[in-house]
Amino acid sequence: MMHVTGEPTADRLVLRGLRARGHHGVFDFERRNGQEFVVDVELGLDTRAAAASDDLSATVHYGELAERLHAAVSSDRVSLIETLAQRLAGVCLSESAVDWVNVTVHKPGAPISVAFDDVSLTIHRSRHD
């Protein structure tokens, strides 16, 4: 995970526990009724310019990003959390300051016939992939 200068991108911005209702899943009842999805994102970016200038435009506006992620979960149905995670990674990487992202999609209401706490998928995507 390198910044464009060749230096490692050590700075991370984390948004955890974003909740949104989506109609994703393999089964008809999931797509019809919907359920809550929980999203965590970890963004790799260089925050030195923002810290030096104290200027929001030099970093990621996490409030706006949260709204865009929420909209991405709430829109266009997909069958797999893998597809949803890829969509969310694309939202994060559309921010020019972001070098890489880890996206975790939790599906706590997944239709599993035994007791469980959560099912989740984490993906890593880079601007250079």
Region locations from a protein language model:
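N-terminal, polar/charged subdomain of small-to-medium soluble alpha/beta proteins
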Residues: 1-129
